[in-house]
């Protein structure tokens, strides 16, 4: 699972429940920004403050319960947005959270 270039544009399409009214989208200039957005959605839904460390297993459970999440990543070669699976984003979120936990 190779990451996109650091400056890749990403559009996140998220549907939190089966009701289409729960659909949201967000637009990001990097993979890190997209992951930080997902972490922010988790913190908002779980009433976790930014200063608290994130329980990674609870984050994964929350992420698994999201009805649908599609990251569209801009590919300069094709000059198009390429859809990725929810697990692709989860993999990169895991790397991000693991690295964040190692920072004192």
UniProtKB/Swiss-Prot annotation:
InterPro entries: EHR_sf, ERH. GO terms for biological process: nuclear mRNA surveillance of meiosis-specific transcripts; regulation of siRNA-independent facultative heterochromatin formation; regulatory ncRNA 3'-end processing. GO terms for molecular function: molecular function inhibitor activity. It comes from the Eukaryota. Pfam families: ER (PF01133). PANTHER family: ENHANCER OF RUDIMENTARY ERH, ENHANCER OF RUDIMENTARY HOMOLOG. Belongs to the E(R) family. This is Enhancer of rudimentary homolog 1. It comes from Schizosaccharomyces pombe (strain 972 / ATCC 24843).
């Amino acid at each position: 699972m190779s990451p996109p270039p650091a400056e890749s544009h990403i559009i996140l399409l998220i549907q939190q429940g089966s009701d289409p009214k729960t659909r949201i989208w967000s637009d990001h200039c990097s993979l890190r920004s997209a992951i930080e957005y997902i972490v922010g959605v988790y913190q908002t839904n779980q009433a976790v403050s930014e200063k608290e460390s994130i329980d990674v297993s609870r984050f994964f459970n929350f992420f698994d319960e999201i009805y649908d999440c599609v990251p569209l990543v801009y590919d300069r070669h094709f000059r198009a947005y390429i859809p990725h699976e929810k697990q692709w984003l989860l993999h990169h979120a895991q790397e991000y959270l693991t690295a964040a936990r190692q920072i004192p």
